[in-house]
Amino acid sequence: MADKDAQDFLKFLKSNASTDEKTRCLDTLRSFFNKNNIPNADLGLFVECFRLALTTVNPLLLRSSVACFETFLRRLRAQYPTWLKFRVPMLKNLVIDHIASRDLQKRVLNILIDLWHFNPSEIEKSLIHLSTTSKSAETRIQCFKWFVLAHNAHLSFDVKSLRPALYINLENANPSVREEAKEVLLLIYKNLSTSAKMQFITDVETTSGLRREILQSLVEELSLISSSSEVIIVQNSASSFQPAPFMTAVATLYPGVELENVKPLLANFSKQLEQDSASMLPAFEGRETEQNWSVRQDSVLRLRQYLRGNACIDYLPELLSVLKTLLPGILLALLSLRTTLSSSAIQLIKEMAIILKSNIDPFLELILPNLLKVCSVTKKLASQAANVTFAAILVNCGVLSRNLSFISLAAHDTNAQLRVFSSNWIFMLISLSPELKNLASLQTNLKAFEKLICRGLADSNSQVREVYRKSFWKLSEYFPSVQEELTNTLEPSVLKQLHLANPNRQAASFNFSGPKRAPIRPLSNLRSFSKSQKEETSSNSSNSSGTRRLGLPQRATPASRERVLPYTRSQAFHSTSLPPSLPSGHSPSIAIPSKRSVSATIKDESKTFELLKNIQRKYELILSGSSVDLPSAEFLSSNLTDALYSGSSICYSLIFSHSLLDLTFQYVDIASLLSQFLLCVYDPSNVGHSFALASFPYVKSHYDAHKYFPIVFDVLMNISNMAPHVKVFPFNTNQKRLIIHGCLLWLKEISDTKLNQLENKPFFVTDKLRYYSSKILAMTAKTKLTSKNWIPLSGLLFSLRAHDTFMFDGLLDRLNEESRTKLVSSWSKQDAFDYSKSSTHQEHLSKNLPTLNTSSSSNSSQTDLLVPHGKGETKETEMQSPIESKEGLLSKDTHIESPQGTSLEKENEEEGKNPVESNCSEESLDDHNIDQTLVNKKETLAQDSESLLQKNNALNEKGFENQFGLSSSAAKVLNKDTLDHVSGPISNSVSSSFKDFTRTPFKEINGERETGFELTSYVNALSKKDDINVQKTENVDESVGLNAMFMDNVNQDSLNSVDQSSGKDKLLLTSSTPNKPTTFFMPANEEILGSPAKDYDIHDQSYSVHELHSENMRENVGQSSLIYNNRDYMNTPMNDFSLSFSEIKGGILESPVESPMTGTISPIDADESVLHDIPAYESLNKSESNKYQEQAYSTPLHHTLNVLPKNKWILSRMHKMENGSPINVDKNLDDAVAALEAAVKELNDGSVNTKTLKFCIKVCKETPSMLYHSHGLLPAILHYIESNNSAMHISDCLILLHEFLVQGYQGVDMHTYHNIICILIEKAEKCKDEPVILAGIEDNITLIAEIADLQGLYEFTQQRLQSLNTETGEKSAPLLLMLLSAILMRLKDLEFLETKDLLRHVVLKYIDHTNPEIRKATFNVCLAVNTIVNNVDETFSILGGLNEGQRLLFMHYLKMKSDEKN
């Protein structure tokens, strides 16, 4: 159609032609649109024609006009989509007025749907506006019908903008409008999940203001609840946690145990619980005030309502998580002085126990101690409520054995009220055993009940005694044997009152005359009672010195009724006498260690930490020659003792450093020091385990072995309660077992490796050896074969026997038959030989040896360890003569195990057991049969030992000198020491009465090759101070290193990391040199703890033995890597370790974004806007831009960096932004370019939306070549980030910046990278409380460190760090340090001198900074340096100036990062 025809048609429509003619003309035009294209010049004329035709009121002409207009739009959509996109508002207005017409409404709705594809927001806004402002009900209805059509056509319109219009029309006066609006709401939300539906209902309740009837109708239609009402849900949910049947019986004893009436509260969705808990947390922070106590009470009440609702059924995991988060606040409310708040918290805990039952078992460790505190208060209301709650917990949740431990604490408390409550709890547990169905558990813990009842029957409070009498008879009903056992141990007065309280006692007869008298007891009872009184008298007379038997401290029963005074502080902690050669500057402390709980205040721990740092600094200055005075001896004694028992990991990192250990040896009682130190070494769950383990070699080298032997022996005797004057130690039974384990291993180590060299020393005399052996032999009677301490004990005795066999056999003959058989049988199974005693020397020694017993008391009721010789002597067992060597080591079949996990701690949880004992039954051992194969094996080992000895002798001085480059004098020393260590046991074995080869922990034989290795001491590897210290270390025999065993041209690939003899995992330490690879073995945890001070090294740096003698040999030490095959190496919980004191106890709330920049932020004096004048962003000029961008964007990049965000939230958001239909550049290039330019404009104007950012990200991701057509995208992104504060859009812009840099990094120069970093740092300072923005900033800075030019970026970072002032900003320093660590990860070596200078400057400046973020970033820099050099010692030398505490912290941080990777 020509231009003239379009003009003629317009004139025809304006003329007065008839309607039929106009209709025919429109039909002809419609047919033309279906078959032909529309000329571009005629578009405006046709639009004007339709504007005129659609304004008519004639229905026939209007219907033809709408039909022709629909065809016209269909042709435009195919021919001119771009033209149509920008004319949607004009075309929409032509037909939207006819939406209410019955004949035209269907076509009009279809036209609007066609226009929606080109401009969705315009169509939606117009319809929403029309639905709320139109006075025509039909118009509103048709607007809603359009949304129904759009929903059925799966068009993603904006529901959030539509909801307010629907809420308004739900209140419309026209019922048809209300129904249509309701239908749209139901259509949108009926297919969603229940949680989404409940979220919608919650929003309607809070924002819409609808009437209750309308809201109830919506809820019913969405099928959320039944039509009856929501009360049905509450009743059904409440019925599911009705109290158990036995609660009725409990209610008879405790009337207040029933649940109170509380209005239930429904949880609509899981997020509701988390949102409510987040709003409750601020109320429980800080101290209780007049303003927040009511808020706390409301929070507690709301939790009780949730428990009564559906949360415990539908959202149990979320509810438990909320309760765990709020548990500290609930306990604060429990201990409140306000009775109202405290009672509410008590009721909450009671309802938790009744409703949640065993689900709250993990919380009981915190709840029960605090409940005991409330039970002991004088407020009757609070104490009685706590009493009832404790009873409810006992019958509903928790393990009986663990609950009994808390009841035992209450029963032994000085508060009479608490003892009365505990007696009632015991009676309840016993009497309700059938209802609780725990008779089996009751029988398992029968001993604990018997102890509590025996103590309660003699309690000073009459109420307590009365209840325990009832408990006694109730327990006797279920276990009749208990009555006979307990009555034999009770006093007559107690038995008399107990008999009177017997419920089954027959009533006395009154039909007799005469005075009343007590019943006549049988003669047998009288005899047994007289005998027990004699034994008790003799026991009291012999035990007057306070000696106690093996086991826990027991209350001695005095012979008279006089009151026994407790130990005084000085008597209870009697100091061990030190050898005369020990330092005598100050006498050791005799103060009792502070028994502070782990829950000590943060302020006190921080004060202790700072105090230790000051003491360490002063002591190091004194060592360096400065004139500084230490505090007084009393001050050092008390504070070092408190720090030793503080239980804080940060304090242990200092107290177990070498300098403070020296002070601790001088000012703290050595028994207290060694007992606590051994506990830390052998308890992997202790927070000081890793630090004590690292310092163990240094502690061993502090004194000579012959001086340590009596000290460790005294600790062993005191811990096992076998000393004449027992000291009081603040340890429980399990801890004492661990200390005993460590003492036995240490004594055996000294006996095996050191005492052979002391035959001419004053220590090595027969009398002392006899004394030590007799005392240790006494421990065999109370140590069971299945105990973890049995193998170390038997190994120690076997080692002591090797020094003087004649004397030891005499002691062994005096031992009772049972203990002697058990010990000898254990030796035979361990070392594969029979043992027989000789009657010739038995008679000789029996006259001179003292009588040996397991305790100092002479109680005749106990079995003596030594069997008296004479007529009553039993027939001796015939055994062969022992074949042995002086080494006397245990065979490899009996490798002494060190503590692994908490196996030692789990042997016996009862406090009443001896720490040397085990609860397991003894094994029956057979020590009379010898397998012939073991004898053959012995001969084979003897032959191997001879061949190995010949090879070792072949290593002469010249060989050492040639192989290791040592001087002749050094070779002599080394050759002598090495051969002593290597061939000493072998030569002794060969020269002894039999040729038996004993295994050492650091030996492995592969085929015919003998391999050895040497690991230096951790003390020397961690801190090599100067030549004086090295020389001093050489002079000390104990700290020279391990047994020097060198490899003899062995292929190291054949070495295994598992000890073939014991099956224990080893830590493999590999060191490679250019000429000859060398592989060393790192001993596992059990061998580290059981070996001498010189026999192991836990440092991850490998050294050769000649490094101790020549500094020049350090060059041959290559890079090493440590493979952690043993998880028990440094088994410190991560939550117990931190880089500073503020990070130990400071609670950091977890944010949705895991960003190292988030968390607790230290307060600052002034905000920092910029570091200095940040240069404005300068874009490239046109020529430079064309040069770079033509190179980068002329064709799609085939090489895309694989750099993904490390933050999970950002990565998820990026994937969500990338979803959608791909961009088709071939067909819509002009449109895409226009859209990209529009996006740049929106970014510059600050009016960008999510859809625009999503489009830009897809452009960068899918079609990077389009970036060539837009020169201002990067400046626009940076401008928007710098000038806007919308968190969501800023985070999306940071994602866009990430994608732009990944795809277009080749076109960005270094100056632009500098500007980007400056803008990001400035933004981080402004948005330091926005974790999402901080995570995006960190991601982009890390990306820039990966893609930018390394030299230019390093120079920029160096300049910024040197001019940085951390006092005016909080985020600048962490970000720059993070950038520096990322730059270092790209380096292969630190070849520039200025690099090392910068690292020293940065680390020394920020490693002790008050801001935890800066400290963590500094340790990451240290970690990056260690990754480059792959050598911890070289890392310390590069950083320089780090003290021992900082080095230990870095070692622990390195281990923590290694565990995270694994």
Curated annotation (Swiss-Prot):
<dbReference type="GO" id="GO:0062194">
    <property type="term" value="C:cytoplasmic microtubule minus-end"/>
</dbReference>
<dbReference type="GO" id="GO:0099070">
    <property type="term" value="C:static microtubule bundle"/>
</dbReference>
<dbReference type="GO" id="GO:0005881">
    <property type="term" value="C:cytoplasmic microtubule"/>
</dbReference>
<dbReference type="GO" id="GO:0005829">
    <property type="term" value="C:cytosol"/>
</dbReference>
<dbReference type="GO" id="GO:0061804">
    <property type="term" value="P:mitotic spindle formation (spindle phase one)"/>
</dbReference>
<keyword id="KW-0175">Coiled coil</keyword>
<feature type="compositionally biased region" description="Basic and acidic residues">
    <location>
        <begin position="870"/>
        <end position="896"/>
    </location>
</feature>
<keyword id="KW-0493">Microtubule</keyword>
<feature type="region of interest" description="Disordered">
    <location>
        <begin position="838"/>
        <end position="928"/>
    </location>
</feature>
<feature type="compositionally biased region" description="Low complexity">
    <location>
        <begin position="574"/>
        <end position="589"/>
    </location>
</feature>
<dbReference type="GO" id="GO:0008017">
    <property type="term" value="F:microtubule binding"/>
</dbReference>
<dbReference type="GO" id="GO:0060172">
    <property type="term" value="P:astral microtubule depolymerization"/>
</dbReference>
<keyword id="KW-0132">Cell division</keyword>
<keyword id="KW-0206">Cytoskeleton</keyword>
<dbReference type="GO" id="GO:0051301">
    <property type="term" value="P:cell division"/>
</dbReference>
<keyword id="KW-0131">Cell cycle</keyword>
<feature type="compositionally biased region" description="Low complexity">
    <location>
        <begin position="538"/>
        <end position="552"/>
    </location>
</feature>
<keyword id="KW-0597">Phosphoprotein</keyword>
<dbReference type="InterPro" id="IPR034085">
    <property type="entry name" value="TOG"/>
</dbReference>
<dbReference type="GO" id="GO:0090307">
    <property type="term" value="P:mitotic spindle assembly"/>
</dbReference>
<dbReference type="GO" id="GO:0005634">
    <property type="term" value="C:nucleus"/>
</dbReference>
<dbReference type="GO" id="GO:0005815">
    <property type="term" value="C:microtubule organizing center"/>
</dbReference>
<dbReference type="GO" id="GO:0005876">
    <property type="term" value="C:spindle microtubule"/>
</dbReference>
<dbReference type="GO" id="GO:0005875">
    <property type="term" value="C:microtubule associated complex"/>
</dbReference>
<comment type="subunit">
    <text>Interacts with microtubules. Interacts with dhc1, mal3 and tea1.</text>
</comment>
<comment type="function">
    <text>Microtubule binding protein that regulates the stability of dynamic microtubules. Required for mitotic spindle formation.</text>
</comment>
<dbReference type="InterPro" id="IPR024395">
    <property type="entry name" value="CLASP_N_dom"/>
</dbReference>
<dbReference type="GO" id="GO:0072686">
    <property type="term" value="C:mitotic spindle"/>
</dbReference>
<dbReference type="GO" id="GO:0000776">
    <property type="term" value="C:kinetochore"/>
</dbReference>
<dbReference type="GO" id="GO:0062195">
    <property type="term" value="P:microtubule bundle maintenance"/>
</dbReference>
<comment type="similarity">
    <text>Belongs to the CLASP family.</text>
</comment>
<feature type="modified residue" description="Phosphoserine">
    <location>
        <position position="1221"/>
    </location>
</feature>
<feature type="coiled-coil region">
    <location>
        <begin position="1342"/>
        <end position="1367"/>
    </location>
</feature>
<dbReference type="GO" id="GO:0005635">
    <property type="term" value="C:nuclear envelope"/>
</dbReference>
<dbReference type="GO" id="GO:1990023">
    <property type="term" value="C:mitotic spindle midzone"/>
</dbReference>
<keyword id="KW-0963">Cytoplasm</keyword>
<feature type="region of interest" description="Disordered">
    <location>
        <begin position="528"/>
        <end position="563"/>
    </location>
</feature>
<dbReference type="GO" id="GO:0044732">
    <property type="term" value="C:mitotic spindle pole body"/>
</dbReference>
<feature type="compositionally biased region" description="Low complexity">
    <location>
        <begin position="847"/>
        <end position="866"/>
    </location>
</feature>
<feature type="region of interest" description="Disordered">
    <location>
        <begin position="573"/>
        <end position="592"/>
    </location>
</feature>
<dbReference type="GO" id="GO:0001578">
    <property type="term" value="P:microtubule bundle formation"/>
</dbReference>
<feature type="modified residue" description="Phosphoserine">
    <location>
        <position position="599"/>
    </location>
</feature>
